[in-house]
């Protein structure tokens, strides 16, 4: 018989930097899950990734207080900022104040868009790479990035 699911917790945790402080501790603690067990497992799985990369994670909590977690690809905005050479960190560079109208904050090529789309395909709600590129192009425009050929 399968375990009964009591809920899901969605978090964005920096790779290799999971610790029991907020937001992880309170989110898992209120479900009665072992916080340190998650932190150790997550850090072990993300050890080979670049430190600080934001990783979306979905934690499934079961009635017996056990859990499983699924990691997704980093957000599209992370890939776009990295490809455009914008500042990454705790307070990332904000995009354009008037996307599509005013000055652009950076440039990104079609090849870079395609590369990002191929990485994000499993997490996106689309069937073809072309539609994934179109979605990511829209995100780039909304951030104030200019797409060049």
UniProtKB/Swiss-Prot annotation:
Native source species: Methylobacterium radiotolerans (strain ATCC 27329 / DSM 1819 / JCM 2831 / NBRC 15690 / NCIMB 10815 / 0-1)
The cross-references to Gene3D superfamilies, in alphabetical order and at most eight, read: Ribosomal protein L11, C-terminal domain, Ribosomal protein L11/L12, N-terminal domain
Q: Which gene encodes it?
A: rplK
Subunit field text:
Part of the ribosomal stalk of the 50S ribosomal subunit. Interacts with L10 and the large rRNA to form the base of the stalk. L10 forms an elongated spine to which L12 dimers bind in a sequential fashion forming a multimeric L10(L12)X complex.
Lineage top rank: taxon = Bacteria
**What post-translational modification does the entry describe?**
One or more lysine residues are methylated.
**Keywords for this entry?**
Methylation, Ribonucleoprotein, Ribosomal protein, RNA-binding, rRNA-binding
Gene Ontology CC: cytosolic large ribosomal subunit
Question: Lineage from the top down?
Answer: Bacteria, Pseudomonadati, Pseudomonadota, Alphaproteobacteria, Hyphomicrobiales
User: Which CDD domains does the record match to this protein?
Assistant: Ribosomal_L11
Q: Which family does it belong to?
A: Belongs to the universal ribosomal protein uL11 family.
Record carries keyword rRNA-binding? yes
Q: Give the protein's recorded name.
A: Large ribosomal subunit protein uL11
BP GO annotations = translation
State what this protein does.
Forms part of the ribosomal stalk which helps the ribosome interact with GTP-bound translation factors.
């Amino acid at each position: 018989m399968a375990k009964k699911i009591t809920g899901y917790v969605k978090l964005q945790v920096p790779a290799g930097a999971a610790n029991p402080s907020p937001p992880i501790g309170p989110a898992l603690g209120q479900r009665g899950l072992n916080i340190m067990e998650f932190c150790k497992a997550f850090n072990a799985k993300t050890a080979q990734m670049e430190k600080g990369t934001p990783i979306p994670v979905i934690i499934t909590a079961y009635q017996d207080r056990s859990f499983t977690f699924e990691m997704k690809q980093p957000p599209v905005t992370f890939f776009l900022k990295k490809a455009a050479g914008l500042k990454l960190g705790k307070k990332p560079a904000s995009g354009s104040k008037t996307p599509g109208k005013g000055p652009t904050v950076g440039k990104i090529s079609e090849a870079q868009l395609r590369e990002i789309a191929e990485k994000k395909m499993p997490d996106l709600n689309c069937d073809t790479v072309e539609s994934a590129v179109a979605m990511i192009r829209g995100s780039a425009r909304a951030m104030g990035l200019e797409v060049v050929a």
